[in-house]
Every structure is written in structure tokens, then in C-alpha cells.
């Protein structure tokens, strides 16, 4: 199973965030910080739950401290972050997805207990259960919306296939179409 481009961007963003904080590793807290700033669905779900990116970053600095900003690139993922990525793969498999998307990272984060990211979420007042429920609800809504749009698209294609655009044909139409009142009036006059 491969990572979606958005997921790869989030992992790279987490590495940049770790480096800016002076940490020589990428942990689950860095992944959470990247997800809170994600402009798409995951960031939206977190913001709806009241997770503020700036406040979360400030709490991460208080809890884990700032390292040395001029360190070389982060040395890799912590075991916690590795488990989070494996959990995201399991979530993608459960949902029969071909790619690991940021939403799957969020679901894995909700299931992961005792992680640094989980601690930051708890401080924000978000439990794993709330996060999981909100994410699943959003994914269900998104799936239903996409299915509805697809059905409407099929209907429109059928309508276009089996109908004619009368406005486009207006120049070739007879001048009597749509003029029932006038025709009835003329017939009434002629019949007198």
C-alpha cells in the first residue's frame, strides 16, 4: 500500500516542524502539528474539535522543550511515529482504500494510546473516542456526498443523451411552438 501525496506532504511537513523546533527526531507530536496545519479535511476536523495549531505548538514546546535549531536534518521517526504510520496503513486497509491518506493518520492517532500526540490532544480536550467518531462521521459524510454527486452526474449525462437542447435548436424551430394562446385565438377568429 502506498502513501497518498497529501500524506507524504504531511510527513515532510512534520520533519520540517521537528527541525524548526530543534528536535533530531520526528515523533507523533510533530505529525499532529503538521496535521493541525493541513488545509484539507484533516485540518478541518481538528479545527472543528477546537485544536488550535499555534496553541498546540506552544504546548508541545512546553512539554517536550526546544532543541537546537541548527541540528542536521531529523534522524528519523520515533517508534511512536512508526507505529502511527503502521496504524494508518491498517486503517486504510479497513476502509478498503488503495492509498494511505491523512484521514487514516488521524484515525490511527485516535486509536493510539499514550502517545505524545495523544497527550497534546487530551490537553486540547479531545479524547481518542471523540476524534475517532468525528473523523469517521466526516469520512462517511464525504463518501455520501461523493456518491450523490456521482449519481447526479450520471443523471445529467443521461438527460443530455436522451434529450435535445431546445434553445440551441430555436433557430430551426417553427414559429408556432410555444404559442398555444395565439394559435387558439387565431382558430377562434377563423371559425366565426
Regions found by a protein language model. Give the residues of each.
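Histone-fold recognition with a strong bias for associated Lys/Arg-rich disordered tails
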Residues: 1-192
Amino acid at each position: 500500500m502506498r502513501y497518498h501525496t497529501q500524506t507524504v506532504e504531511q510527513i515532510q511537513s512534520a520533519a520540517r516542524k521537528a527541525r524548526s523546533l530543534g528536535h533530531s527526531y520526528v515523533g507523533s507530536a510533530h505529525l499532529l502539528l503538521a496535521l493541525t496545519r493541513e488545509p484539507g479535511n484533516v485540518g478541518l476536523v481538528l479545527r472543528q474539535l477546537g485544536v488550535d495549531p499555534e496553541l498546540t505548538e506552544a504546548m508541545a514546546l512546553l512539554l517536550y522543550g526546544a532543541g537546537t535549531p541548527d541540528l542536521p536534518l531529523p534522524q528519523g521517526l520515533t517508534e511512536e511515529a512508526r507505529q502511527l504510520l503502521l496504524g494508518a496503513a491498517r486503517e486504510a486497509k479497513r476502509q478498503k482504500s488503495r492509498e494511505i491518506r491523512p484521514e487514516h493518520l488521524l484515525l490511527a492517532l485516535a486509536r493510539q494510546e499514550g502517545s505524545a500526540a495523544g497527550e497534546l490532544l487530551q490537553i486540547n480536550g479531545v479524547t481518542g473516542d471523540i476524534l475517532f467518531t468525528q473523523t469517521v462521521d466526516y469520512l462517511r459524510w464525504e463518501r455520501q456526498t461523493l456518491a450523490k454527486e456521482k449519481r447526479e452526474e450520471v443523471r445529467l449525462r443521461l438527460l443530455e443523451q436522451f434529450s435535445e437542447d431546445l434553445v440551441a435548436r430555436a433557430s430551426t424551430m417553427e414559429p408556432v411552438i410555444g404559442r398555444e394562446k395565439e394559435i387558439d385565438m387565431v382558430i377562434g377568429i377563423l371559425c366565426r
